[in-house]
Structures are given as structure tokens and as C-alpha cells.
Amino acid sequence: MRFAYKNYPTNRGGDDWWAALPTQLANSAKHSPPCRKFEALIDSGAAICIFHSSIGESIGLRIDRGEEDETTGVSGQATKIYLHNVSLYVPGHILKIKAGFTDQLPLAGILGRAGFFEHFKVTFDPSSNPPGFELERIHRA
């Protein structure tokens, strides 16, 4: 499945292209319906999928009751996250994953290696017009 990059304004006044995917989450434990769609950044440098706490709260998670962990971004600063089992909805697929939640995330969500890349082969193609990426589902035994 092919998707166009999303064009986002930068702090420097220009624009940048991001590989972002329409995403939803649901609370697996409560069999709840998925939340409203939001854009999640595809980030091969992220170890796991991380979402803003407000999204977890909207599906009934008690964020601070999750398994406490830490993640470190490119700044080198450690950020406390809370892990929860959720259902991740991406176009055409529903995945059961363990994801981190924090109120320190400056965007709605990040799709990382554990939880996303382990299920998809992602091919980035910034040379196409418009620039885009392709997702191919990996089915494991």
C-alpha cells in the first residue's frame, strides 16, 4: 500500500516531508472502539511505538498504572513512559502491540521498530512525485 509523505511546516519557516500514517488505538483489555484518527510519524530510529498520554486516556487507559520504563531520543534526555497493551489500527490492519505513553511527546504518536516495523516492510521513496512510502505486511509464523 502506497502513501504520500505529509507536508509539515518547520520552525524555520519552511516545509518538510514526513512519513506519517493515519492511525487509531483501542484499549484491548476493554474491547473498546478505536479512538479518532490521528497522524503518527513512522520512525525507524524509535525502539517502540510511543503515543501521547491524552490518546491513551481517551481510550480508557490509566496511564500511570502501566509498566514504567524509559526511552531516550536523539537529545539524549531520558523520558519516562508507561507501557500498555493496545490495538493499533493502521490502514487495512489491526495489530496487538505493547506501546509506551507519555505526556512529554511533542506529537500524537511515533511508530517504532517494536510494534510497527516488526509487522511491515517500509520502503521510503523521496524521489517519487509526490514523495512517498510503501507498506508491505510481513506475516510471521
Which residues does each predicted region cover?
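Pepsin/retropepsin-fold aspartyl endopeptidases
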Residues: 1-141
